[in-house]
Amino acid sequence: MSLSAKDKTTVKKFWDKVEGKSAEIGGEALGRMLVAYPQTKAYFSHWGSDLNPQHPMVKKHGAIIMGGIGKAVKNIDDLVRGLSALSELHAFKLRVDPANFKILAHNVILVAAMYFPADFTPEVHVSVDKFLQRVALALAERYR
């Protein structure tokens, strides 16, 4: 599942459109993950027991997540190196199960498609999905 030159161009062009709404997309994607996959709330229990998509910390962290995806777009030619610090943080300090990266990627795709339905063509879907799966693999790199 490597990214072709066309995939990379497609991801970059779509990110240019998404970036202005990335905080909202990230907050909604994280909120959806917490509702649809309630076991993921365990990683955020320090925010309190009322974790829901409208919780200010969910929205704030969603923006941080999308900042990480933006960093990945900038490092699209070497995701492992570009995301090594984030991989180390999630593996050794936060101890996040790397399976959650794919769950979150699914929710980011879903919300991005909702925000940009005309731009989210099947070709964009394929390229963004491949990209986010590569991001998930890069984030899991330090777990090995």
Swiss-Prot record:
Q: Which GO terms describe its cellular component?
A: blood microparticle; haptoglobin-hemoglobin complex; hemoglobin complex
Coiled-coil stretches noted in the UniProt entry, renumbered to this chain: none
Keywords from UniProt, A to Z, are: Heme, Iron, Metal-binding, Oxygen transport, Transport
Instruction: Write the protein's name.
Output: Hemoglobin subunit alpha-B
**Function statement:** Involved in oxygen transport from gills to the various peripheral tissues.
Assembly and interaction partners = Heterotetramer of two alpha chains and two beta chains.
Q: Where does O2 bind?
A: 61
Alphabetical list of CDD domains matching this protein: Hb-alpha-like (cd08927)
The record's InterPro entries line, in alphabetical order, gives: Globin, Globin-like_sf, Globin/Proto, Hemoglobin_a-typ, Hemoglobin_oxygen_transport
Which GO annotations describe the biological process of this protein?
A: hydrogen peroxide catabolic process
Positions that bind heme b? 90
Tissue expression notes? Red blood cells.
**Could you cite one Gene Ontology molecular function of this protein?**
haptoglobin binding
Membership in a protein family: Belongs to the globin family.
**Pfam families reported for this sequence:** Globin
